[in-house]
């Protein structure tokens, strides 16, 4: 038995959905353990593209159990929209194979309103939130006033919690942010109207995981966003509102850390970032535009154009340290075709010193100068390669250099969007 954690090793959008979809074939269950519908995982099978924001990417495999853990914040509307979308495509989304932890917190309308109001008030100092209420929902969780999925079975409890929440939220919306307050009865009615459809999906996720492990089945833990968006270890304050590191797979679905055997870091062959925040290797020239165009770098959730730049080995070394990555899945390697040369950032210059690690002080990463190592580019079309030895020598050299700089083996190489366009070493 080998349970596997999948995490993004950069700032998100590394191609986790495709790798989760592929590894799901070897697993009994796939579990989301953090984040919400601010993540967008894209899977392409036989030319058909599916984008999922909440439901685990393994749902496209008919015989797999898919679970949403307690560490996820769940928008009931988005969950049901995904259920309906998948059902219309013939995917089995019955409660027999899809479950939500009763401990998962629910994103409420006032969370979304607060998210948008705060971002609007920040003006030129925006964090880059998706406005989907993720942060405010996690705030209520930490303040011990949030609604959990299991509360839906008790309408009186729902009404009491909404009434308590709106005393504060409406004051903030109306008086501080100059936004319209929300109607208590309407909020309750909207949520309780969804309860009959949601309640069958509520379950004890920990119990499912324990039973599958007892039977010798493998579990795939699916992370969202990327390591450097982690609330504690990311480029604060330009981070998400949850822990995205591999260790949170344990807390986010209720299993002991000894159940986590393998950690696969998903690494894009270049680097991208959405929204604000430091990005040492960002390219604002034709190279950045080429990567964005060739890589179709627009957010699956927001549609926003992604910032693009060269691969940063300093960032990846930090990812290995934080998450204990056992191996790497290198994605979007085909996007680099036809660039005259390739560059990898191997160190930073900062205040007269050369650093091989990320400085921790807030704002410091914005002041570093990347130190690059240049490698030859390639013109060959690699999208049809099915074995590692089929790749051009220059491509194999690029991969080997990444392994040397990071200290972790590249076990998978993605050379196209399709499930089949993946080389396993």
From Swiss-Prot:
CDD domains: AdSS. InterPro entries: Adenylosuccin_syn_GTP-bd, Adenylosuccin_syn_Lys_AS, Adenylosuccinate_synth_dom1, Adenylosuccinate_synth_dom2, Adenylosuccinate_synth_dom3, Adenylosuccinate_synthetase, P-loop_NTPase. Substrate binds at residues 300-306. It catalyses: IMP + L-aspartate + GTP = N(6)-(1,2-dicarboxyethyl)-AMP + GDP + phosphate + 2 H(+). One of its GO terms (molecular function) is adenylosuccinate synthase activity. Its main location: cytoplasm. Its EC number is 6.3.4.4. GTP binds at residues 12-18, 40-42, 306, 332-334, 414-416. The keyword Nucleotide-binding applies. It comes from the Bacteria. PROSITE patterns: ADENYLOSUCCIN_SYN_1, ADENYLOSUCCIN_SYN_2. GO terms for cellular component: cytoplasm. The active site is at residues 13, 41. Pathway: Purine metabolism; AMP biosynthesis via de novo pathway; AMP from IMP: step 1/2. Binds 1 Mg(2+) ion per subunit. One of its GO terms (biological process) is 'de novo' AMP biosynthetic process. Mg(2+) binds at residues 13, 40. Keywords: Cytoplasm, GTP-binding, Ligase, Magnesium, Metal-binding, Nucleotide-binding, Purine biosynthesis. Plays an important role in the de novo pathway of purine nucleotide biosynthesis. Catalyzes the first committed step in the biosynthesis of AMP from IMP. Homodimer. Belongs to the adenylosuccinate synthetase family. This is Adenylosuccinate synthetase. It comes from Desulfovibrio desulfuricans (strain ATCC 27774 / DSM 6949 / MB).
